[in-house]
Each structure stands twice: as C-alpha cells, then as structure tokens.
Design a protein with these regions (language model features):
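Short, acidic, Ser/Thr-enriched surface-loop or helix-capping motifs
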Residues: 25-26
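PLP-dependent aspartate aminotransferase-fold enzymes
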Residues: 78-168
C-alpha cells in the first residue's frame, strides 16, 4: 500500500525516466508527456542545459533567504525582466504560490489607488490553480472545496468558452 496521500486517482503506470517530451515506463513503453508534470517541465526531461546549470549551482548554494542578495538570482531576474513586460521579478516555489502572489498583487494594486472594494477576481469555473485555500476557491470546483470551509471569498466564476457570461 502506498504511503502517498490519495489526492489523485493514480493510473497504474510507472515511469522510470524521460527524455525531452517523452516518458518511458518501467515496462519499456514510450509516452508523449503532454501533461509535462502538470505544466512544470516546459524544458522537457533530462534537458542537458538545465542539468548543467543545476549541477553548477548545486556546488555553490542551494538556497538562502530572499532577504539576502544572490548573484545568480539577480542575473536571472535581469534576463527575465529584459525579455518580458515585467519591471521586476519575484521567484515562487510553485504555481499555487505564484497564483496567490497574483491575487495579492491585484488586490494590493486597487487598494493602493484608493479602490479597495475592487477586489473580486474572474476565474474559469472548474479550473485548477493549486491546492492552497485561496487557489481551490479560485477554481470554482465544488469537488475541490467541499469540506474546506469557510469559503475564501472574492472570486466570480464563468464557464470556459461562454463569453456571454462575462457580461454579468
């Protein structure tokens, strides 16, 4: 019996390794990894450039608090800001943490311009944003929120593809 929490209905497939966009099961079958580890493996499996960067950094520092200056973090933030719309970067540990940061940033923005009551966020019903309290309520999924009351308020939901419902 597995000691892992039963938060997924696991398939009876076990993977031993991956290469690029493909996964290889323990019985030797090749699969296209269209899920990409729930969208976290965008560079593919066993990416040689990523392996090299991880190995190089692991020999220096693993992590220190963001209360300190980390030269490699500064360098990466500069590169990302230069190639995107962003003026500054905040690194997050997960998609849920990034979503929480986006919720807070949106609410703080309207608070800072004197519109604190403008705090509701539109979300696609039955979407997935993570497993924190705020992100499960952002999902609009009864299955995900059942038993986790009281409700985290501030989210309005619309059906995916139903543009008319956005006018409400």
């Amino acid at each position: 019996m597995s000691a892992l929490a039963k938060n997924y209905n696991r398939r009876k497939i076990s993977f031993k390794n991956g290469k690029g966009s493909f996964l290889y099961s323990t019985n030797g079958k090749k699969y296209l990894d269209f899920i990409q580890g729930i969208a976290v493996n965008s560079l593919g499996h066993a990416n040689p450039h990523l392996i090299k960067a991880i190995n190089k950094q692991s020999k220096k520092l693993w992590h220190v608090s963001n209360a300190f200056i980390i030269p490699e973090g500064e360098k990466l933030a500069q590169r990302l800001a230069k190639k995107t719309f962003a003026d500054f970067i905040i690194f997050q540990n997960s998609g849920a943490e990034a979503t929480e940061a986006a919720i807070k940033a949106a609410r703080r923005y309207f608070y800072s311009i004197g519109q604190p009551k403008k705090n509701r966020i539109l979300c696609v019903k039955d979407s997935f944003h993570g497993r924190t309290l705020a992100t499960i309520y952002a999902s609009g999924s009864k299955k995900m929120t059942e038993g986790f009351g009281p409700k985290v308020d501030g989210f309005d939901h619309f059906e995916f593809g139903n543009h008319k419902s956005l006018k409400k």
